[in-house]
Amino acid sequence: MPDYRAIFRQLTVEENLKIAERRPGDLARKRQFIFEIFPDLEKLYQWPGGQLSGGQQQMLAIARALVPDNSLLLIDEPSEGLAPVIIEGMMAAIRRLTAQAAVLLVEQNFRVASQLADRYVIIEDGRSVHSGTMPDLLASPALIQKYLSAA
């Protein structure tokens, strides 16, 4: 379980979302969409962030990024520390987000990345060592052996 999730633990779910507003009314405009993607957050609206499960905290962190209008979302390791059943829900939510904005996903779990991304970049020691589509990646036995054999 990660030590840190990008939420305010003492604030309620509502307050965590409200704090992300850039303009008055941002949350009111996005609230229904957020609850369609993350229905658990509606039920937990008055709960403190610190009382949410790890998966719910991840959902809240992503939901907070949705409050202002963004054309690009950077989502870093959304599956880290989550149970498989929670990961499935998170992946479904991220798929829905791609209709609203471009998503740059950083993910070490190959199964998750392979189901969400249409382009891939493999980074080693801070350098891009491969970029392309899944067929490009799978066409290289050397890349499969080096980077995916343990996936």
Where are these regions (language model features)?
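ABC-type ATPase nucleotide-binding domains, specifically the catalytic core motifs of the NBD
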Residues: 10-29, 39, 132, 148-151
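ABC ATPase signature
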Residues: 11, 51-52, 65-66
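Conserved ABC ATPase signature
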Residues: 48-52, 56
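A short, proline-enriched helix->beta-strand linker immediately N-terminal to the Walker B motif
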Residues: 66-71, 100
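Catalytic Walker B motif of ABC-type/P-loop ATPase nucleotide-binding domains
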Residues: 73-77
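Helical segment within the ABC ATPase nucleotide-binding domain
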Residues: 87-100
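A short, surface-exposed alpha-helical micro-motif characterized by mixed small hydrophobic
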Residues: 113-115
